[in-house]
Amino acid sequence: MTETARMYGGSLYDLAAEEGLDERILGELEGVTALLNGDAEYLHLLSIPSIPKKERCALLDEAFRGQVHLYVLNFMKLLCEKGALRELPGCARAYRLRYNEAYGILEATAVSAVPLTAEQTARLHEKLEKVTGKHIDLKTKVEPAVLGGIRLDIEGTELDGTVRNRLAGLRSSIAAATL
């Protein structure tokens, strides 16, 4: 995430939080970001310098007025005017981080070889909340290469309890013992 994205996203969060709109704006900002990420041609069109800024902003108005809160629309128009619309995903990420910080939420990803059952996911979620004392936004991911066990990534801290990791450790121990 760039410093520009951090600054713009953080500023939007401050405004939305002050107005009690932080949750609504978060949802709309992430939705608009996903939409624009899925339409590279439209995003490119909004970034062409030869098209006057006024026309590019009018395109945003036409597409999003009445669909999103005015703060989100004006934020996108501001980024468009500054030639920084491609920073929108970073801005949304910065906004999300500020939101999570304000509400005591940690993002966690559990990677396993097979899909976790609903019960396993619920138990893991409960255990993580108990251990951290924070609310956990838990996502699960399947990677057959882990072979078994679970690898947790909690905001950049990795806890690797996978079979693959244990085998790698065993391999290193055997290699060190034979030297």
Predicted regions and their residues:
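Elongated, mostly alpha-helical coiled-coil "stalk/stator" tethers of large membrane protein machines
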Residues: M1-L179
